[in-house]
Amino acid sequence: MRIGQGFDVHAFCEGDSVILGGVTIPHSHGLMAHSDGDVLLHALADALLGAVALGDIGHFFPDSSEEWAGADSRDLLRRVMQRVLDEGYAVTNIDTTIIAQAPKMAPHIEAMRMNIAEDLGVPANRVSVKATTTEKLGFTGRGEGIACQAVCLLEAVSQ
């Protein structure tokens, strides 16, 4: 068994939507990023890579590379999952928490779960996506950005 933990944060910028868990959510701002800014999938990718001791997404998809400019984070997550499989591990479960004052996440949580389950090749009952606010405290509470935490549990695949 392996456990991985990931964290990501992106600041708000001009825009009219954010992408979280591969779901486009209308909002008064976008997220500043080299890729599509999906903090949920970035935190999850870091958790998966950490669990198999391969570092972080910045190592594989550097923001200094034009190759990854505007990248679809679902594609990045699928690439990370392939590396996890190549290391001989499979997902037991995923638990994530989006930290944001806005936009409201509840209407979009199920679609996020389904996207993640599809990209990881696991049943949806192994994927948890939760959301919380910081009661208007800190940078997320002031509406300056969105953060996400992710934890994964992996098990060795029988050869």
Swiss-Prot record:
InterPro entries: MECDP_synthase (IPR003526), MECDP_synthase_CS (IPR020555), MECDP_synthase_sf (IPR036571)
Pfam families (alphabetical): YgbB
Entry cofactors: a divalent metal cation
Key words, A-Z: Isoprene biosynthesis, Lyase, Metal-binding
Pathway: Isoprenoid biosynthesis; isopentenyl diphosphate biosynthesis via DXP pathway; isopentenyl diphosphate from 1-deoxy-D-xylulose 5-phosphate: step 4/6
CDD domains linked: MECDP_synthase
Reaction equation(s) it catalyzes: 4-CDP-2-C-methyl-D-erythritol 2-phosphate = 2-C-methyl-D-erythritol 2,4-cyclic diphosphate + CMP
EC number(s) from the headed UniProt entry: 4.6.1.12
Site label Transition state stabilizer, positions: 34, 133
Keyword check for Mitochondrion: no
Binding residues for 4-CDP-2-C-methyl-D-erythritol 2-phosphate: 8-10, 34-35, 56-58, 100-106, 132-135, 139, 142
GO molecular function: 2-C-methyl-D-erythritol 2,4-cyclodiphosphate synthase activity; metal ion binding
Cofactor note: Binds 1 divalent metal cation per subunit.
HAMAP family noted in UniProt: IspF (MF_00107)
Purpose: Involved in the biosynthesis of isopentenyl diphosphate (IPP) and dimethylallyl diphosphate (DMAPP), two major building blocks of isoprenoid compounds. Catalyzes the conversion of 4-diphosphocytidyl-2-C-methyl-D-erythritol 2-phosphate (CDP-ME2P) to 2-C-methyl-D-erythritol 2,4-cyclodiphosphate (ME-CPP) with a corresponding release of cytidine 5-monophosphate (CMP).
Subunit annotation: Homotrimer.
Membership in a protein family: Belongs to the IspF family.
Protein name: 2-C-methyl-D-erythritol 2,4-cyclodiphosphate synthase
Organism name: Marinobacter nauticus (strain ATCC 700491 / DSM 11845 / VT8) (Marinobacter aquaeolei)
